[in-house]
Amino acid sequence: MFNTYTNSLQWPIRSRNQQDYCSLLPERSESYKLSKAYTSSRCYCVSSRSSCCCCCSTPSSSSFVKPKVLINPGFVLYGVRQSTLIQWPSFQRRLLVGGGRLMGCEVYSSCDGIRRKNRSFKLRCLEESDECCGGRSCSDDVEAMISFLSEELIDEERKWNLVSRVKEKKKVGNVRKVSVEGSNSYGNGRVSQRVKKPEGFGRRKEIKEDVKLNERYDCEHCGRRKKSSELESESRRGSKLVTGEYIGKSYRGDEEREVRPRRRKSSSCSSYYSLASSGEFESDTEDQEEDVEIYRENVRSSEKKVVDQSAKRLKSRKEASQMHSRKKRDESSTGVDSRYQKQIFEEGENSNQAVTLNQRRRKKFSQTENRVSESTGNYEEDMEIHEVHVNDAETSSQNQKLFNEREDYRVHSIRNDSGNENIESSQHQLKERLETRYSSEDRVSEMRRRTKYSSSQEEGINVLQNFPEVTNNQQPLVEERISKQAGTRRTTEHISESSEIHDIDIRNTYVSQREDQIRNQEVHAGLVSGLQSERKQQDYHIEHNPLQTTQSDRTSVSVSHTSDAVRYTEIQRKSEKRLIGQGSTTAVQSDSKVEKNGAQKEDSRLDHANSKKDGQTTLGLQSYQSKLSEEASSSQSSLMASRTKLQLVDLVSEEMQGSETTLIPPSSQLVSRRSGQSYRTGGVSIQEISHGTSESGYTTAFEHPRAGASVNSQSAGELMGFTSHEDAMGSAHRLEQASEKYVGEFVKKAKHGVINPETEEQRAESNQLKRRDSRRSSGGSGAKGPSDEMWVTDSAQGTPHPGATEGNAAVGNAIFKRNGRSLWNVIADIARLRWGSRAGSPDSSAKPAGRSSPNESVSSATWFSGREHDGSSDDNTKGDKVLPQEAPSLHQVEVGQTSPRSQSEYPGTTKLKQRSERHEGVVSSPSSTILEGGSVSNRMSSTSGNQIVGVDEEEGGNFEFRLPETALTEVPMKLPSRNLIRSPPIKESSESSLTEASSDQNFTVGEGRRYPRMDAGQNPLLFPGRNLRSPAVMEPPVPRPRMVSGSSSLREQVEQQQPLSAKSQEETGSVSADSALIQRKLQRNKQVVRDSFEEWEEAYKVEAERRTVDEIFMREALVEAKKAADTWEVPVGAVLVHDGKIIARGYNLVEELRDSTAHAEMICIREGSKALRSWRLADTTLYVTLEPCPMCAGAILQARVNTLVWGAPNKLLGADGSWIRLFPGGEGNGSEASEKPPPPVHPFHPKMTIRRGVLESECAQTMQQFFQLRRKKKDKNSDPPTPTDHHHHHLPKLLNKMHQVLPFFCL
């Protein structure tokens, strides 16, 4: 140690070479890695007469130094080179601490140190040397140098005053101030630092540190020498800006730091050892503290770059956002969505930029941490070297403090990193949410991002950056703002969804309206086409039938009134949804198809028939629109009358007895069976059964939904679709055409019995009308559809009567056999046999001329057209012939025919009376028809098993025509033929000839019913002018089948009571002039019975439905009552119903709420008023399990409750007759006492419906069970078990055990 000191001390004094190596070159330290980065390898001494500026020495000094001593350039003063310290001034020794600070120097003016990071040091060495020294170094005397150094240290101690103040002031906003005051006192290397932790976050702004050191020392041997050195160290330390990206606030802080180095006073010594041993030698810990300060400055400088870079970007983004906000104000017309998207985009951009800035800052902090770790390692190495020289405990304690301080710094940096990581993770999550939520806005975001970046480059504004802690504190605010934005977005989405739903509703409404318009246009087109064809046919038939003009006029007038009815018919047709064929077409389409097949005659007939059907349909629809509450009886009867024209009646052979009959329930029975009146002013309509094309190419319009304008059954709101075989229907059609020419002759023969002069005048006109009706019937009456029920049986053979004419015989002899192809051939055979028997049979009934009774019959043409003709027609004097020939097991009917009267008398003499009938008809069950045509009425009704057409005319024969029941539905029901019910026959007598049909002359039909049997040569039966209308039962009636109505048994009971008068008159057989009057009275009685029965039935159905609904809601009230019982309240529950929905519930809460008014009814009224937002509870129904008390009754009346339904009576406090009566009389068997006065009439709510006793037993049982349980509970509470007995039994046992244990312890 001594040698090292001596050699190293002498060499620098004698050094005169110009270019000598520095004695502290980094090459000497093999282990120091960063030496080349901070120091220069050479020190140039330009003047040989001047010594190097404190750091230069010859390489010979290396020979005097031990070779492998590690020297850290940052701490040069450590180790064996302390001799150099003796020659250096104190300020140079301070500046050299910190690693390579002054390794290259120029003697002339300054020694420029190394620029570390953001710090630059300038050293100006001003030398003023006296001439006495001659520019040379001091004396060679070491002792003189030591004394010089001692004096220098003393002067230095006196003059040393280093004050470094750092002041930061920034005005950013209303934020907290930060002040950091640190003072370092370098006394014996101790460092004490006083730091005030920042209350907020501040910005350190442009710290200038001026260090001025003036030293003066005298050289005793060489005279006075003044050397002043001034060190100016200016470092612009990085400023830290704390910006809250989401709060936009900054903080202001002041930091003041005072470093006052102190030294121990020591006396000068004459030797180096005394100097070192006295402890006055400057401690190396000062350099360590300097290094700590330098490290802090380095950290600050490193943060400065990060802050500067991020601040610029954030400030530019802030300015860009401001620009966007201005743009948004200018572009406010774009709407809420654009503004909302911009706001979301700005938030996303800020979060993304914050994430990138945090990543960069994290990288910088990681680099700083690396440097901290490296400096820590270096510090440990230096401590090892320092421990060789400094061994006292005080120095080690100081080093320990410094080390702890360094560790605090490391912990602080680690916390910063962890905070950054947390912020980064949270911001990553935020970024992911925003990206997933707004992925559809990537393009717009990219464009705006480019705009912002360009604006940021143009602006170039410094933006403040926030600390990690600020971001950490800001996170709740960010989340709150995000939640608000999410709520705003949900609101916007809800508004958009509601607008879309509104648009969809508008579109649907438009589409439905458009469909209605198209439908109406098509219907009108069909009507117009029908009218055009009708006008064409009118020109052809106007000469033959002048009455056709009147019919066409009526049709044209009624067209304008039928659009609404047609629309309603179309809607009802859609609701019924018949399973019908796919080949139905309109009447116009059928016309075109017929033209293709090339039947000109049939085409003209079809056009004519279609035109008439259009007119008749429009009239029917008009009547339907006027009386929608009427039944389908008129439609059925008219259809049955049209069937009469075809004579499709009870023709069943014995072959058919074992076969099955297909009964197809009508659609009207399946749906509503409601139809309107059908005013038929003219034209005979027949029922067409085919739906395909026959051999002649005939088509029908049964099934097409838009041919409804010409469909007669659609006037009743029914689509009569019936599938049949083409060939069978074609044959029937051809047969009908062939029979047209025989209609006139048949009418003449039917009325051959009596000839009236007045009828002879009308004969030609009647024949023409019949021909026209026949053509219309054959042309296209299929559009009118079949009746409500259609029966289909096997074919039977029949032979015409030999007395028939040639044409009739030819037709009648045509026997059609079943070919096995299908069941529809049966219909053709029946039709042929019907027409043949009709043409060939001379059997008829007629009555003499005179005033006709209401039961007198009319011709088949009258049945179809609905007209009543003049009594002057001689056809009325002719007896109507019953045509069926007696054949084995053939069903026959009695038909009386009269010629029609002139149409001019029709409007004044004819009225259509229709009876509203839902399901059943006159006698037994639905779908039977009775047509009564009289001078005053033409009533049509429907019966299940019977279809009786009775036509009464002023002048004409009397007859009853029994039609088979017909049905039309989607799925036919197969029933045995014997289940078909026929009306009982009528035993009729004549006034003139008094001819009666004996039982032998009757033949069995169906189930054994007997009808009069007519022979070919038999004279026509002359029926009395006033005959009984009701049928006479020749044999006991057979039980009738129940087809549709569930109450047909009741109707059968009514039916059994009807024919009593008929039986009595049949037994007596007396024919008197007053019989018609008696029969009329009986019919009125029957009609009253039927009407009252229907009313009863309807009322019963309504009551049953209402009772079911009441029971459903009353059970809900019972549920509420059980809730009250669970809490030991009186089990009374109530529900309030509005439009079929429960809007309020309540149960008794008197005990729980301690409120005497908290009854179930009161709670329901309160909640219902809240639900409806009105104290008026109109159109509501209150269901209560117990009869209301007076308080609740007053509240119910005051709330204007429409209906009250209660269950069990309240015998003590009931306000509905049990105690007092406050409600008006209602329904049910409530507690009504005769002695109670009538209830007062409420002035504002006089009409109120009360229904009593709904689920009375259940409600009463609930109350009884509750009171029984409560009495049991009271009994248990009144007699509780005495607790003394329980303890009394246990106490002696305890004492006994204690006595047993005591001897054990004593032993």
Swiss-Prot record:
Biased composition, class Acidic residues, residue ranges: 281-292
Annotated GO CC locations: chloroplast
Keywords: Chloroplast, Coiled coil, Hydrolase, Metal-binding, Plastid, Transit peptide, tRNA processing, Zinc
Domain of life: Eukaryota
CDD domains found in the cross-reference section: nucleoside_deaminase
Basic and acidic residues bias (residue ranges): 293-321, 439-448, 592-615, 760-771, 866-883
Localization terms from the record: Plastid, Chloroplast
InterPro entries associated with the record: CMP_dCMP_dom, Cytidine_deaminase-like, tRNA_aden_deaminase
Domain CMP/dCMP-type deaminase, chain residue ranges per copy: 1108-1230
Cofactor names: Zn(2+)
Co-factor remark: Binds 1 zinc ion per subunit.
A GO BP entry: tRNA wobble adenosine to inosine editing
Bias-annotated ranges (Low complexity): 267-278
Entry keyword annotation includes Hydrolase: yes
Enzyme Commission code(s) on record: 3.5.4.33
Region annotated Disordered, chain positions: 245-377, 439-458, 544-563, 576-618, 753-807, 837-957, 975-1073, 1268-1293
Catalyzed chemical reaction(s): adenosine(34) in tRNA + H2O + H(+) = inosine(34) in tRNA + NH4(+)
Coiled coil: 280-309
PROSITE patterns hit by this protein: CYT_DCMP_DEAMINASES_2
Free-text note regarding domains: The C-terminus (843-1307) is sufficient for the deamination.
Function: Deaminates adenosines to inosines in tRNA-Arg(ACG). Exclusively involved in A-to-I editing of the prokaryote-type chloroplast-tRNA and not involved in C-to-U editing.
Subunit structure: Homodimer.
Leftover remarks: Since the absence of A-to-I editing is compatible with plant survival, a limited two out of three codon recognition occurs in chloroplasts, although this mechanism is less efficient than wobble pairing.
Protein's UniProt name: tRNA(adenine(34)) deaminase, chloroplastic
Naturally occurring in which organism (per UniProt): Arabidopsis thaliana (Mouse-ear cress)
Taxonomy of the source species: Eukaryota, Viridiplantae, Streptophyta, Embryophyta, Tracheophyta
